[in-house]
Amino acid sequence: THCVVFENPNGASFEQTGGIFQKPEGQAFLQDLFTVAEDGLEGGGTPILNFGEADFNKNPYLMLINVRVSDAKRYSQLFSDFMNSSDLPGSATMFQDTFTGEYKRTHYIAISGPSVDSLRETTSASLSSQDGENFQRRAANIRKITSTYLMFHVKSWNE
């Protein structure tokens, strides 16, 4: 019924928002929030492909892409070929959805980077390349993007 939304004019402003939650007041807010809130992006998946360095200390900013795929084996091959030709600043992991709060999602892709701007620029450059255009053309009949999100880690159960 509710969500927390920040509007940011640029990538640097988005990145500064994360600092709010590192302060004691931000941590207290999150603790209170978790007593009355239910996650909207609830779900879980099994990682099936990984590319690059998945170090969230170096690459704390995430792009999440939810997709519905009709031929998982074919899409995985197309995605692998595309990722092998891309120059990622961080990592990309494709997950097969195990249970979901996202309507009709079968897979999701998490791409990490050192900044929001680097994520956006690298993704744009990769998709605009010849390999990116080939990937998009070949994947068009078997994959539908259902939603995308820009996120940053506030807390991790591993810490």
PLM regions with names:
Residues 1-159:
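Short S/T/G/P-rich N-terminal loop/turn motif that feeds into the first structured element of a domain
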